């Protein structure tokens, strides 16, 4: 049975690419045609890639791999958090901070700081501080929660990065490739398939398209770990 049907992808608008002048020629194998100055993605190729991505992701999850979902643009942010949480993966959905992977020691220290502040807040320790100091600590807590909240369960570098919008997340791509961390990437017609191990050609701007792809990948992770795809909130941390 197909992981995703052509009708599902059509309804999600997964076939709409970018304007033809913005294309990357390396994506030509995944493009069906151009219509009104816009490239149309070949959904038969997308279906094949989705099947491959599902199997690869399921196998990786079954072998205990840890996943990081990355998508910081408005259309993807909420979906990234939802689907990553559903399958117990870590996520970045606000802003990619330089060194999140390549300077992991420093990043881990910031995550530990976030956990410390959360404990202080829940225990009432911050409320007991002088008003000005408490205000400073709460601002720090809010900032860390915004940018690092999705990484609290990540005690080590991820084994796989799942990416929405390769062009926007250039720094994430560069860091993952520098560390030889494989990428499962949604690829619009302006992307480079050579920069990922598991390509999924599709519209990476439409919310429904992002929901469809990330939802299936989350299903694959849950199936690989638990033998079912309906687990919610299972944690892949090392704690």
Swiss-Prot record:
An example Gene Ontology CC term for this record: cytosolic small ribosomal subunit
Record keyword Lipoprotein present: no
Annotated disulfide bonds: none
Swiss-Prot/TrEMBL keywords: Ribonucleoprotein, Ribosomal protein
Name by which UniProt lists this protein: Small ribosomal subunit protein uS2
Recorded name of the encoding gene: rpsB
GO BP annotation list: translation
Signal peptide: none
UniProt KW Chaperone keyword: no
Annotated family: Belongs to the universal ribosomal protein uS2 family.
CDD domains recorded: RPS2
GO molecular function: structural constituent of ribosome
Superkingdom field: Bacteria
